[in-house]
Amino acid sequence: MSVALAGSPAINATQYEPLRVMVVDDSVVIRGLISRWIEAEPDMVVAASLRTGLDAVNQVERIKPDIALLDIEMPELDGIAALPQLLAKKRDLIVIMASTLTRRNAEISFKALSLGAADYIPKPETTRESAGAEVFRHDLLQKIRHLGGKVRRRVSAPSASAPMVARVREAAAAPAAPSVASQAALVKRAFGPTAPRVLLIGSSTGGPQALMSLVAEIGPVIDRYPVLITQHMPPTFTTILAEHLMRAARRPAHEGVDGELIKPGRIYLAPGGRHMRVTRQGGQPAIALDDGPAVNFCKPAVDPLFTSAIDVWQGGIMAVVLTGMGSDGMRGGKDIVAAGGSVIAQDEASSVVWGMPGAAANAGICAAVLPLNQIGPKLVRLFSGDRS
């Protein structure tokens, strides 16, 4: 039996053992709701449903979960205090932080990412609002499935010389995404002939840490050119991310404002809940925020940014697709390449999830597929005139 959520790869549930999920939340209502969602999926099970971080720390070695969904605000031991203790006891544990959309919780979520959490998910203020609960369900199951791809256990026949279960890595990307060993074969395009005049970046799962690392390395690019970023992230979280990017880059960074003129020396981040597009205002490049429907199940989405920029910069676009689930950015990347621009994708080994960059690489649109720590230096050279 194959299962998939929209934007997720199909998983043959009969070939893999179910992912073991530990749900840690002080709300019995939330624990019950999430547990029912998980148990309804054939490729995952609830390994434990616990009330506090202390319960999780005391029982994680016995439970042996693959993934922990960890609430931030709990009695006895909260999520941020429990996180390092859980990872110390089970180093391969994948932790997803869960919190409501407050500034304090957004800041704590960013701290959790720096301490080793794999991702975060915003909880709805109330589960009685059906639309909000459905979005939460969709996003949660998608994250579990994609992040769990790295530890999913393939079912094998009993053998005297082999264990029942072998750990295998399954790329959380498009079904045909190539392995790390074959990535060199994907690089088939030369960089576009036009000197880049703008840097566009798209990212999702694992993106905040990747973005902070990248912008810290591209100061010479930011000083001379505008940088526009779409990170899949809700409101409040993008506000905090912009502040972190400003500190990492030591250059101005803020959420894009509708009608704002785009200038070199600044980083513009798509605000949560709005698509960020590029338009012209009085002949000058400007931000246009769009409150339309989600694109690729995301809002903000990368494709609207990528595609809209072509009318302004034509072939002078350098686009980077970083770690993330799904395939957002691939279609926009195709449009950029068709217009004479260039695309770089993060490689699988350095990605938390090789979905978005894998889709771009597999589509044959990339001029380079690089580890994260090589993308910054490459961009500095490219924007300095080195087209090799």
Swiss-Prot record:
The active site is at residues 204, 232, 328. Its EC number is 3.1.1.61, 3.5.1.44. The keyword Chaperone does not apply. Residues 20-138 form the Response regulatory domain. Residues 193-386 form the CheB-type methylesterase domain. GO terms for molecular function: phosphorelay response regulator activity; protein-glutamate methylesterase activity; protein-glutamine glutaminase activity. Its main location: cytoplasm. Keywords: Chemotaxis, Cytoplasm, Hydrolase, Phosphoprotein. Disulfide bonds: none annotated. The modification 4-aspartylphosphate is found at residue 71. It is an enzyme of class 3 (hydrolase). Gene3D superfamilies: 3.40.50.2300, Methylesterase CheB, C-terminal domain (3.40.50.180). GO terms for cellular component: cytoplasm. PANTHER family: PROTEIN-GLUTAMATE METHYLESTERASE/PROTEIN-GLUTAMINE GLUTAMINASE, PROTEIN-GLUTAMATE METHYLESTERASE_PROTEIN-GLUTAMINE GLUTAMINASE 1. HAMAP family: CheB_chemtxs (MF_00099). Contains a C-terminal catalytic domain, and an N-terminal region which modulates catalytic activity. Involved in chemotaxis. Part of a chemotaxis signal transduction system that modulates chemotaxis in response to various stimuli. Catalyzes the demethylation of specific methylglutamate residues introduced into the chemoreceptors (methyl-accepting chemotaxis proteins or MCP) by CheR. Also mediates the irreversible deamidation of specific glutamine residues to glutamic acid. Belongs to the CheB family. This is Protein-glutamate methylesterase/protein-glutamine glutaminase. It comes from Rhodopseudomonas palustris (strain HaA2).
